[in-house]
């Protein structure tokens, strides 16, 4: 569109992937988080200093986020308020959350 020879650009609102369950909207995220790494073997000091931490990626719907926890699900019943593939993360382990666009 133009107005007096000037092009007008309308900014399009982003649309995000989501699920609607019992009239509530749940958004889909890519969540990056840190997980512990365990090893029951013996280690010297140098090996202890090099212990890695696991950097994990989860893709899921966010059920609830509080100051302490992030609760997610990946599957749900289309006819009832039933969730599967659930996780609860301590919020301190979460590095980032990116809402997925359509």
Predicted regions and their residues:
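N-terminal amphipathic/basic-hydrophobic helices that include classical n-h-c signal peptides
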Residues: 1-10
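Conserved RNA-binding domains used in RNP assembly and mRNA/RNA metabolism
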Residues: 11-102
């Amino acid at each position: 569109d133009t107005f007096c020879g000037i092009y007008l650009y309308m900014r399009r609102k982003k649309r995000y992937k989501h699920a609607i369950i019992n009239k509530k909207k749940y958004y889909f995220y890519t969540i990056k988080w840190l997980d512990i790494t365990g090893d029951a073997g013996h280690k010297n000091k140098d090996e202890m200093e090099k212990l890695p931490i696991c950097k994990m990626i989860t893709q899921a719907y966010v059920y609830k986020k509080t100051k302490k926890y992030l609760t997610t699900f990946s599957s749900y019943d289309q006819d009832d308020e039933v969730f599967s593939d659930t996780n609860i993360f301590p919020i301190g382990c979460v590095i980032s959350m990116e809402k997925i666009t359509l």
